[in-house]
Amino acid sequence: MPFTGRSQLLAPLIAFFTVSETPVEDLRDLEEDIDQEVGDVLDEGQRFLAEELFASDDLVDAIQEEEGKVLTVYRDITGLPTVGAGHLVRPEDGLRVGDRITEAQMREFLKGDLKQAEDGVRRIAKATPLSQNEFDALVDLVYNVGPGNVLPSKSPKLNEALARGDYAGVARELSYSKARDGRRAGGLVNRSERRRRMFERGEYGDPREG
């Protein structure tokens, strides 16, 4: 069964105590205690195969903070139609610059883009185990630059480091400071630093606020 994070570990215990008719307030206290213990385990850097991991809520929050939540289709710095949390508009979306989407549509786009990024990480990580924060940092990278740009042909050093299990080497390859048109972008520089801290330290906050 794929590892889906805290909820998967909590579910059997909560179900047991629910069947035993434990009072609701006690269940809430129990869930908080267990969640803290589980969080401590995951935060210590326990590693899993990438196929067992999924983007965490902390990463989703970080992505939305970096990308923004824009409900009107606009052109990004390279001129491509974009909407929501950095979703690149595709022909099948049926949207043009100036069109508006709903919050629900934004969430659906984000969900689909995250899945694509997760799959992109699984393709390059293969059998190399990753901690939750390492996986999240790589998902952010793929989400930001696109799955094609992290393949061996485009990012050979990143793939070589992953194949060797060289985590320090992977961290060094997380920086992408140029937009699709080759221009250096300050936002990408800052995001790369955030991504590196996420990978190395499990810190998800914006370093610009420190």
Where are these regions (language model features)?
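Active-site nucleophile-His-acid catalytic modules used for acyl/amide transfer and hydrolysis
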Residues: 116-153
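Long, amphipathic alpha-helical surface segments
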Residues: 2-51, 57-75, 87, 104, ...
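Aromatic-anchored, charged helix-turn/loop surface patch used as a conserved interaction hotspot
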Residues: 91, 96-125
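Residues that flank catalytic or metal-binding motifs in active/ligand-binding sites
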Residues: 59, 77-79, 134
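Flexible, active-site-adjacent loop/turn segments at secondary-structure boundaries
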Residues: 72, 81, 86, 128, ...
